[in-house]
Structures are given as structure tokens and as C-alpha cells.
């Protein structure tokens, strides 16, 4: 049965925007990180390129303008920008949020108040006037001096107000695990909402771990958007449970192409990938693993030794996360541990972190992919390369299992704790058998899904008349990875593993938030004592709107806050701990 899409959210023809020049579109993705992340860069670049080629003048939101200018394209000065389709990208720095849950919640509340004042029907407020708002006064010390933070907020809001559209490009960070990234996107969407700039959300994974507060932030963001696509069935179900219009699609980087395979990262002295890339084995298994125990490293080495003996696939270790200025950071640490356990007769190649353009070239040349990361599976499945995904937690299972499921390969995921007993070897053999007889029909079908979604997005942004929503997502049969009853046993173990990991993840999120608010309460109490000798009339929080930001304790399956506890009441952490233990 095909997945049901929501009804068209396209503007009626009478409301469609019309532009005398290329519309300015802000694309939000996790680019500009000094610790380079191949998948994050690839998703953003693919989205930006499609929009630019389709007629938009693209601005990329980045964590570091110089970094993105070096690895994506030359930065353009805003005043000198041509605002033409196909012109070099402009860049807008992120409004960065603190990591701690309490601090990011306070920051979003303050930014919301600044936006309200900026868009009120009166004279534009000054920095001094905005700085004395109670919500701004309550900002965490990491954002002091307040005047500088307010100026940055105003600049950020003004930049978004100047856009014709905002596209939140794909990613897996809309959850409490990466809550500061969720809030950074929420801030951009709220700025667009206040300025009546249309928002579009593409290729997202939602959750799976979300505190009730973070879930509310995400829900508002998605309801603001005119169009939402998600990249796995579980994310679609999350939207449907809340009555949010969404469509199932594929990852934004599914059709990523290397614009310049010779483009390299800026490495520390003495590090180079050139020779290793020139001397890759003729037949190899591409390995990307970001975490494993010592026992699992030994088991993975035995699996790779077996693949060399049985199939002639030499392991090529390809990092997807790492700092090019620190050759020992990121995935390569795990790769070195696994490679050290290989048999002396198994040839191995360890590559440093590569530019996304070079990474996709390595992936497409592989005979097999073994990965615990998401985008190696995406790139390989899209290229018809057999994949076995190794799953360390529910977060990875939801994403990589969801991606492979769209190709009918959802059974080819295995918890890292099940590497013993010959199961991985059986799954490798099954993946190779399927790849030998599989046609490219499903891959072509999914590429057409992405092409149609992008055409729909462009039609809405460009205002080319009323558009019908894309056709329902095509269904597919899942390919067995193991004979029965072994397949059923592995499925049951995978489900139990996922449930256990989800529970642990939710408990961590609640504990992290409780500890964060406890520290914030102590800070505010100390501040109140320092300036007034005791509590203010508004309690520990002062007048910054504590009603919206106090921590709550909830049941693990609850979707709404339970009773609000007064922050001054002692024993908050003890009560949370008792709830988690129960």
C-alpha cells in the first residue's frame, strides 16, 4: 500500500508570489563545523544546488562563513550580491544557542520577546530598550554582555526578514540529543514566522528522543511550515499522531554528486589523502564506524578478515566525522582500533576525513559498505551497493533502518551487540546475493520521488501557479536478510534493543534537563541574593516568564507536561531520580 501524502499545501494561484528577480532563499543546514561532517555538508549542498539551479538566489546558514566559503564556494558580500539564480552563495551565520537545556530554553524565550518587540506596530526599539526586557535579563551568563547578544538577535532577525523563503534542509538533529541544534532552527523559523516569510522543511528525522518541552518547540516549527517532508516512516507517524501535514520522502543527499572530486580539506601539516585515494584497491569494502567496544572491534576485524578471504574485498576505512587539523579526531580513532586487530594478511587502507565530494567518490567505487553511520548507507543504497548497517543505539536504528527500509533493505541492520555467532557473515552473503540480481528500478523510483519533491518546493517558492502535492510514496517489499527462524530471532532482538535504548535515551534527556535547570536555579538564586538580599517578587526566575520554562516531571509515555513543580521546592533532582528508577 502506498504511503498517503497530505493534501497540497501549495498557495492558491491568487496568492502565489511573483518576483522580478530571483527569490532569496535561506537554506539551513549543519555546515561550517570545524569538525567536518560529510553527511551534514552533503545534505545542505545538495539542497542549495537544486534550489540555485531551479532559479533561486541561495543564502546558506553556516557556523563559520570562512569555512563554508573555502569548502563550498566563495562568500559574497551582501551589499555586492547579485541576487540572481546560479550566483555564488551568500552566507548567514547561525544565531548560536547554548547546549544546556535550561539555557537554550531561556534563549529561545528571550529571542521570541525580541521578535515581538521588533514586529510590534510602533517605532523600532533600541538595543538598550530590548536589553532591559525581563526575558533578556534572564539570559544565561554565557550570552553576556546582553547588549551584544541583543544586537546579534536583531541582525539575525532582520536578515531572515529580508528573505523570500526559508528552507530547513534535511538532518537528524530535531531531537533532545542535539537540542541546541533544534532550537537554532526553531529560532530561525520563528523569525520567519514573525516576518511572514514562508518556511519549508525537507528530509528530516524527528526524534526519537524528545522531552515534552522540546517536542512542543518542534511541533510549533513544523506547524509553521507550508510543506514538510520526513525521511522515514517513524517520523511520518510522529507527525500524523499530532495532526501535522507531512509527506514521506528520501534524504536530501540521496542524489548528491561530486561537483569537484579534486576538492580537498585543509589538513594539518604532514597529512594527505591524495596518494591513498590514487591507490585504492580494485575491490573493497568501505567501512565507517563511529563507536564500538574493544570486543566489538575484534569481532569487526574478524568479519573483515572473512570478507577478504571469501570475497576478496579489502577494507577501506572512510571517516565521516573528524577535524582535518587533528588527524587523530573523530571516526579514525575507531578505525585504527579495528585495523589493529586485522590479520596480517588482510590489506587495509585508512583514509583521513575527506571532503564530501571525495567521500561520495570512494563510496561509489566500493563493492560493499559496512557502517554504523547514516550517510554511508544512504550513498551506497542510492548507488546500488550492498550495505550492512551496524546499530549502536535507537537513534541510529531509526535513521539508518528507516533509510534502508525505503529501498526494501530494512532487514539489513544489526545491533552492534550481535556481531558474534556468524550472523553478520550470513547477512553479508544475503546482501551480496540480492545485489547480484536486483534491478535499478527502486533506486530510479526514489530518485524520482526526490526530483518531484524539489520541483514542488520550487514551484511554491517561485510562485509558478497552483501545484498539486506529489504522488503517494511508492511502497516496497522488504528483502529477507536471514533465513527463518533466525530472521525472526534477530528482529525480536532488534526491537528489544531499540526499546531499551529509547528508554535510556528518554531518561537521559529528562535527567539532563533537570540537572540543567537545577544549576540555573542556583545561579539565579545567587544573583537574586547578590542584588537584593533574597527572592524577588517573581521568585527565583525574576520576571522572565518562569511559567513557560520551569522543569516538569512526566511519565515516559506522556506527551504533555504533568504538574508544574515550583523551582524553589527542595529535592527536585531526588524526585526526578525516583521517577526514572521507577
Where does each model-flagged region fall?
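Active-site anion-handling motifs in enzyme catalytic cores
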Residues: 2-547, 553-555, 572-580
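Acidic, proline-/serine-/threonine-rich low-complexity intrinsically disordered repeat tracts
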Residues: 550-566
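Residue-level signature of the cytosolic catalytic core of signaling kinases
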Residues: 396, 565-568
Amino acid at each position: 500500500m502506498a504511503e498517503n501524502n497530505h493534501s497540497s499545501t501549495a498557495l492558491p494561484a491568487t496568492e502565489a508570489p511573483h518576483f522580478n528577480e530571483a527569490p532569496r532563499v535561506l537554506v539551513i543546514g549543519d555546515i561550517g563545523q570545524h569538525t567536518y561532517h560529510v553527511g551534514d555538508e552533503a545534505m545542505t549542498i545538495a539542497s542549495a544546488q537544486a534550489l540555485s539551479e531551479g532559479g533561486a538566489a541561495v543564502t546558506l546558514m553556516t557556523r563559520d562563513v570562512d569555512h563554508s566559503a573555502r569548502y563550498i564556494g566563495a562568500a559574497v558580500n551582501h551589499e555586492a550580491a547579485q541576487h540572481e539564480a546560479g550566483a555564488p552563495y551568500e552566507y548567514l551565520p547561525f544565531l548560536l544557542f547554548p547546549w544546556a537545556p535550561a539555557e537554550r530554553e531561556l534563549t529561545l524565550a528571550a529571542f521570541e520577546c525580541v521578535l515581538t518587540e521588533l514586529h510590534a506596530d510602533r517605532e523600532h526599539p533600541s538595543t538598550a530598550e530590548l536589553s532591559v526586557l525581563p526575558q533578556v535579563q534572564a539570559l544565561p551568563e554565557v550570552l553576556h554582555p546582553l547588549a551584544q547578544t541583543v544586537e546579534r538577535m536583531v541582525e539575525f532577525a532582520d536578515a531572515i526578514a529580508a528573505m523570500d523563503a526559508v528552507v530547513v534542509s534535511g538532518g537528524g538533529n530535531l531531537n533532545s540529543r542535539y537540542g541546541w541544534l533544534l532550537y537554532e532552527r526553531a529560532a530561525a523559523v520563528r523569525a520567519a514566522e514573525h516576518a511572514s516569510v514562508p518556511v519549508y522543511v525537507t528530509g528530516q528525522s524527528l526524534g526519537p528522543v524528545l522531552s515534552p518541552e522540546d517536542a512542543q518547540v518542534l511541533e510549533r516549527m513544523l506547524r509553521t511550515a507550508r510543506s514538510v517532508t520526513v525521511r522515514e516512516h517513524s517520523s511520518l507517524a510522529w507527525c500524523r499522531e499530532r495532526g501535522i501535514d507531512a509527506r514521506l520522502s528520501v534524504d536530501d543527499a540521496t542524489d548528491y554528486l561530486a561537483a569537484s572530486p579534486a576538492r580537498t580539506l585543509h589538513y594539518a601539516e604532514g597529512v594527505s589523502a591524495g596518494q591513498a585515494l590514487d591507490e585504492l584497491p580494485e575491490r573493497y569494502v568501505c567501512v565507517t564506524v563511529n563507536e564500538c567496544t574493544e570486543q566489538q572491534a575484534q569481532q569487526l576485524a574478524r568479519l573483515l578478515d572473512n570478507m577478504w578471504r571469501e570475497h576478496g574485498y579489502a577494507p577501506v576505512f572512510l571517516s565521516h566525522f573528524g577535524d582535518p587539523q587533528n588527524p587523530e579526531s573523530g571516526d579514525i580513532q575507531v578505525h585504527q582500533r579495528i585495523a589493529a586487530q586485522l590479520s596480517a594478511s588482510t590489506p587495509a587502507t585508512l583514509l583521513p576525513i575527506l571532503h564530501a565530494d571525495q567521500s561520495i567518490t570512494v563510496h561509489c567505487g566500493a563493492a560493499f559498505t559496512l557502517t554504523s553511520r547514516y550517510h554511508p548507507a544512504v550513498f551506497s543504497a542510492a548507488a546500488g551497493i550492498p550495505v550492512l548497517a551496524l546499530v549502536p543505539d535507537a537513534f541510529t536504528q531509526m535513521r539508518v533502518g528507516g533509510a534502508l527500509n525505503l529501498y526494501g533493505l530494512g532487514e539489513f541492520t544489526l545491533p552492534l551487540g550481535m556481531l558474534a555467532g556468524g550472523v553478520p557473515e550470513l547477512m553479508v552473503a544475503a546482501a551480496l546475493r540480492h545485489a547480484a540480481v536486483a534491478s535499478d528500478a527502486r533506486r530510479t523510483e526514489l530518485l524520482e520521488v526526490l526530483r518531484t519533491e524539489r520541483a514542488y518546493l520550487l514551484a511554491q517558492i517561485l510562485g509558478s501557479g497552483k501545484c498539486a502535492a506529489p504522488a503517494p510514496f511508492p511502497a516496497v517489499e522488504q528483502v529477507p536478510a536471514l533465513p527463518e527462524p533466525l530472521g525472526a530471532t534477530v528482529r525480536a532482538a532488534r526491537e528489544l534493543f531499540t526499546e531499551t535504548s529509547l528508554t535510556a535515551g528518554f531518561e537521559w534527556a529528562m535527567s539532563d534537563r533537570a540537572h540543567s535547570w537545577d544549576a540555573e536555579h542556583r545561579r539565579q538564586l545567587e544573583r537574586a541574593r547578590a542584588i537584593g538580599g533574597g527572592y524577588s517578587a517573581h521568585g527565583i526566575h525574576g520576571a522572565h516568564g518562569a511559567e513557560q520554562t520551569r522543569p516538569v516531571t512526566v511519565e515516559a509515555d506522556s506527551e504533555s507536561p504533568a504538574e508544574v513543580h515550583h523551582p524553589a521546592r527542595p529535592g527536585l533532582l531526588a524526585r526526578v531520580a525516583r521517577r526514572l528508577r521507577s
